[in-house]
């Protein structure tokens, strides 16, 4: 057990005062500041969210950094995780921790009331162990009551996913009417109803219709568009930045060869504090595939998590069979790359004698036709019915 002597506790009211002071003082407390809060002593505090990616995405304490501790990480950890495993995309945070630049780290889960109630194999416990090995001079505190209590008492210091406007289902046609799967009772195709959906604060997903609506784009603060098609026009080239990925929505298309270029483009827009709309014709297959690849690469999550995350925001996404297969292969490469980085890290797990870390293929390019059945099951993700399975070396 993680005992009281090993882990200090912090009341929600104390964290609220820190955040309020930091906000009034103009300090770094936003989500773009790597979870850093200013302390009265002049030091800096790091806020770590130890909940799963989907829970963090649904709502989180402002400025917190989400740690990665999914099933794959737990299986490999064997009771001990590295900073590279739990913070794979936060190089600056890892460097600051190792340099002792944080005076304190506050960790929180969903609702743990006290440190003594934590299990040894809980995410918080594993994270605390990693912090104690790599940031020995840093105070570590558990937020009492976790996100559940803090968000209940101080919702103004939390960010929650906006409720999505429900898209009315198509009205079943009568026996005398022709079947039109693409339209609802209002005559507007289902994929064009509503507006683009927010995947991340700087990343939106939509259709060609949305890309042609300048009023929608301006209302969302869109500054760039990623056109994942060979035939959709770029309507406002003098007003927005454009990039085209000429991929057809068929089983022969190699969309994975564009993954890294698309990811770099999205990051470039993000770095300029812009917002990008990724679209194809319907915003269902090609553009959804790019958004899934981005989440997998940058958030270091598996396809299962990324798919569920995007589907919660745009329920009609359905990458074609080949694209799903290429995403599964991309998942293997992302995981293999993470493992190689961990093995090369000074604090990473020791390599077993005679074994070498997995080496990913270059450029994350996979060009092959595959068939992956996509079905809608209420209690499982579509691609889980696929005959394709991946067994990452790590």
UniProtKB/Swiss-Prot annotation:
Annotated gene: DUSP4
One MF term in the entry's GO annotations: protein tyrosine/threonine phosphatase activity
PTM entry text: Phosphorylation in the C-terminus by ERK1/2 inhibits proteasomal degradation and stabilizes the protein.
Subunit annotation: Hollow spherical complex composed of 24 subunits with pseudooctahedral symmetry, has a tetramer as the basic unit.
Highest taxon listed in the record's lineage: Eukaryota
Catalytic function, reaction form: O-phospho-L-tyrosyl-[protein] + H2O = L-tyrosyl-[protein] + phosphate; O-phospho-L-seryl-[protein] + H2O = L-seryl-[protein] + phosphate; O-phospho-L-threonyl-[protein] + H2O = L-threonyl-[protein] + phosphate
This protein's name: Dual specificity protein phosphatase 4
Recorded family membership: Belongs to the protein-tyrosine phosphatase family. Non-receptor class dual specificity subfamily.
Chain's role: Regulates mitogenic signal transduction by dephosphorylating both Thr and Tyr residues on MAP kinases ERK1 and ERK2.
Organism: Homo sapiens
